[in-house]
Amino acid sequence: VFPQNFRDLTLVAGTIGDYAAMVVGKDSPVNSMADLVAAYQADPRGTAIGGGSVPGGLDHLVAAIVMKAAGENPADVKYIPYDAGGEAMAALLSGEIAALSTGFSEAIALADAGEVKIIGITAPERVASYADAPTMMEQGIDAEFVNWRGFFAAPGLPADKLAAYQDAIAKMYETEEWETVRAQNGWVNIYNNGDDFLSFLENQEQVIGDLMRELGFL
């Protein structure tokens, strides 16, 4: 997809996944993905979805993945980017956008503050840290996506140093401190290294590349 990519680096390990979420304002008449899709079908141009990334960025891609899985043409979905979370929230509350595409950890913070309702997340099942958030899958929308985090090193890293880094990361999962941070953010552990990490990245590259081509960005 890009001239430089993960193959130019030493792959250390994938660490966590942060699922994506679709949220609406706390007073919105939309209470589910079915409501959002119905509103979109009734008024496509008046039912915009916002996000904190540029067109073609992660929030846009998640909105496209979800709406495509709901049976809509992702290229037709009106996406409005915002530079800051405050701007996006103002747009959501004013009705400029009908929904906001964001990370699940950010959505949890907004929901806990009483500012939004989470109407769908891209996890395969509900996440214990915020079990009230329904998945897309349980609402009949076959959309699953995880925004992963991982570690990379410079090319040519000696094998013994690579193994030491991987061992340190693996041991991190066993600590209480890590579990506290993970649970607070709604993250899921997705530790993988070696060929498993490579296969994961290649699948992500294929899925995202295909969608970006469909949206006309590649």
Model segments located where?
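Soluble non-cytosolic domains of exported or imported proteins
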Residues: 31, 57, 101, 156-160, ...
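A short acidic, helix-capping loop that chelates divalent metal ions and anchors anionic groups
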Residues: 19, 152, 191
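Short linear loop/turn motifs
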Residues: 77-82, 152, 195-200
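An extracytoplasmic/periplasmic, membrane-proximal ligand-sensing/linker region
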Residues: 135, 159-218
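Small-residue transmembrane helix packing/gating motifs
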Residues: 143-155, 163-164
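Nucleotide phosphate-binding site architecture
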Residues: 108, 152, 179
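Structural motif
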Residues: 44, 155, 176-177
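Conserved hydrophobic/amphipathic secondary-structure segments
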Residues: 1-149
